[in-house]
Structure formats: C-alpha cells, structure tokens
Amino acid sequence: MKQSLIDITPKMGVRTPVYPGDPPFVVRLTASVAAGDPADVSAVSFSAHCGAHVDAPAHLFPGTGDAASLPLERFVGPCLVIDLTELEPEAAPSELVRLQTIAAVKALMDGKALPSRVLIKTRRSQPPVWSSDFRALSPECVEAFLAEGVELVGVDVPSIDPADSEELLAPVSYTHLTLP
C-alpha cells in the first residue's frame, strides 16, 4: 500500500479567526531592502490557539509538559480521517459529534480497530471570523475513542469542547494527559 503525507494545516494569516480575547495573527516588517537593509525580514506573532495546534498538558496543568515535550511520533503515522461533511451532511454547525457517529464509522470499517490517530473533518471551510458555532465532541464520543486505544484526535474546529462550555465536557485526562 502506498503511503502519503497529507498536510491538513489550515492557512494562517492576518485574516485567521482567533478565539475572542486572544491576540490576532500579526506580521510586522522588521527590516526592509527598500529602507536600505540587506534583506526583508518579518516578525510573526499569534496566540498558541491560532490555526492548527495541540493543547499540551501544561495548558491546564501548570508544571506539566509543554508542546515541545511531546513526542513527534505521536503526530506522525497512519490515521483515519472521518469526514462528517459527507457522513452527516445535515448536521447543525453546533451539533455535538455523538457516540452513534463513531459507531457508524466503525460499522463501515468491517470489524477493523480504529487506528491510534483519528482526524475529524466537521466543516467544509473555515469561517472568515471567529464563530462559536462548531461541532464539538460529546463526552461519550471521547470515551469511545479512549476505549478503542485512540491516542490522538484532531479536529478542524477550535476545540473538542463547545465554545460556550464553562467546564470541559470531554474528559480532561483524555484531551490533555494522554498526549505525553
């Protein structure tokens, strides 16, 4: 079987939506050929939650590992891509991804186990501005992934928890502690 590397990273730029209150994506020219410098040089700054990112354990648990401490092997290798835009095209933008969805995916796999990495596509395009309308994962869905031995779940939305969640619905042990 031919293997390929698929880059799922969304494009980032000054129009990249950011979580309310987070600093925006900024590109600043720090040196310029036009101003007599030997080269154009830019500085880029943005929130750690901008674009594709991983929440390291230290995000919620001070004194634990940061993103640099996570093994690269966790993020590279075989994975299953679940395209909910095809599987559930009528789902509302803010509808939770439920256990039934994972059961339907497993049924399509003819008894094969889920791989250790799962990516979930929930929308057809990125909104031009921040939107709290996105498909988060239900706690039961996350527990099912845990039970199946899934070590990494990637989503194309800002969080696996709903934007208006006052507490994390998904088990914290899964979303943050299983990464190291």
Please provide the spans of the model-predicted regions.
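Generic N-terminal segment detector
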Residues: 1-36, 148
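Divalent metal-coordination and catalytic microenvironments
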Residues: 8, 53, 82, 118, ...
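Histidine-centered catalytic micro-motifs
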Residues: 44-61, 157
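Active-site environment of divalent metal-dependent phosphoester hydrolases
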Residues: 57, 126-127, 159-166
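Structural signature of FAD isoalloxazine-binding scaffolds in flavoprotein oxidoreductases
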Residues: 61-78
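Glycine- and Gly-Pro-enriched alpha-helical subdomains that act as flexible
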Residues: 83-127, 133-137
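Charged helix-capping and loop-helix junction motifs
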Residues: 134-140, 167-170
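Conserved small/polar residues in nucleotide/adenosyl-binding loops
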Residues: 175-180
